[in-house]
Amino acid sequence: NDYVIYRELRTRPGYLYSKDAVVRTVRELGQLQLFDAQNINPEFKNADPNAGTVDIEYKLTETGSSQVQLQGGYGGGSFIGTLALSFNNFSIRNLFNPKAYRPVPMGDGQALSLSFQISRYYRTYGFSFTEPWMGGKQPVQFSVSFSRTEQFGYSYRSYDVDKSKRVYITGISVGLAKRLRVPDDYFQIAHTLSYQHYDLKNYPNLGLFTFKDGNSNSLAYTISLSRNSSGPNPIYPMSGSSFTISAKLTPPYSLFNKVDYGKLFEERETASNNGDSERIAQIDQERFHWLEFYKL
C-alpha cells in the first residue's frame, strides 16, 4: 500500500528543498527491504528557480519480499526436515479477508515468519511478527515471537529414540522500539520482555543444569540503545555507521523469595564432597527454579 512508502518520505509537497532530506528518504526506502535499494534514484523535474519549487520523483523497483525455505537432509541416523516462511510485507488486518489471499495478505509492511524443523529425536517450531508503525502514526515498532523445542533421548550408536527422556523449552517475547529525536532520529530505544521455560524429565544431557528432572524459568527484561545510519542497502551498506549498547536483567528474586542461598551453597559443597549427585540435583533445582542474572 502507498502509505507504507509515504510515511518514510522526508520530502513532502510544500517543504523547502533539502539535499539531506532526499538522501535520508532514499535510505529509509532502502531499509524497508521491499525495493531494490541499489536502484532508488530520485529524479528532479519541473525546477522553477523563480518560484523556488521542484518536483522529485522516486523511481522504485519492487523486489521479492517473501521467502520460502524447504530443506531436507540425513544425519546421525535421522532424517531432518526444515520449512521456513518469511513475509516482509504482510498485512495482518486482512487476515480474515478471503479476497486478500494472493497467496497471503500483503501490503502493510509488516513482517511475519514461521519456521518448523523436525527429526526423529527433536522438533522445533516458532513464529515472529513485527509491526514497524504501531498505530500507523509514529515509528513505534511492536514485535512478538514464540518458539518451542522438544528434544528426546537419542543414542547416536544404535539410533534409538527414548521418549521417556525429554526436555521441552518454550519461549515467548514481546518488544517495543521507538525512534528518538534527540540527539538525532537515527537513534532508537528498544524494550523487550522475554520468558523461557525449561521442562526436563529424566534428561541429563541438556548441559545447562545438573538436574535431569524438574523445571526452570527465566523472565528477563532487555533495554537497548542503538544508532544506525548505514545504508541505503541494509545488507550491503555503502555509508553510515551502526552501534548498539544493551543490558539484560532478571528480577532480583534472591532479595524477596526468602531462600537462603548461602546455606544452599554450603549444602551443595557438602554433597559434592560426599559424591551425592542426587542431593546436588535437588539443591540446584531449588537454586535455578527462577534464573537470576544480568548481562551488559
Language-model segments: what does each one mean?
Residues 257-288:
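Solvent-exposed loop segments that connect transmembrane elements
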Residues 15-244, 269-278, 293:
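Gram-negative/organellar outer-membrane beta-barrel architecture
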Residues 4, 295-296:
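Non-catalytic alpha-helical scaffold/packing segments enriched in small hydrophobic residues
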Residues 205, 255-257:
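Extended, well-ordered alpha-helical segments in internal regulatory regions
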Residues 250, 289-294:
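Outer/extracellular conduits and scaffolds centered on Gram-negative outer-membrane beta-barrels
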Residues 1-13:
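N-terminal periplasmic "start-of-domain" segments of outer-membrane beta-barrel proteins
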Residues 243-253:
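Acidic helix/loop microenvironments that form the catalytic cleft of cell-wall polysaccharide enzymes
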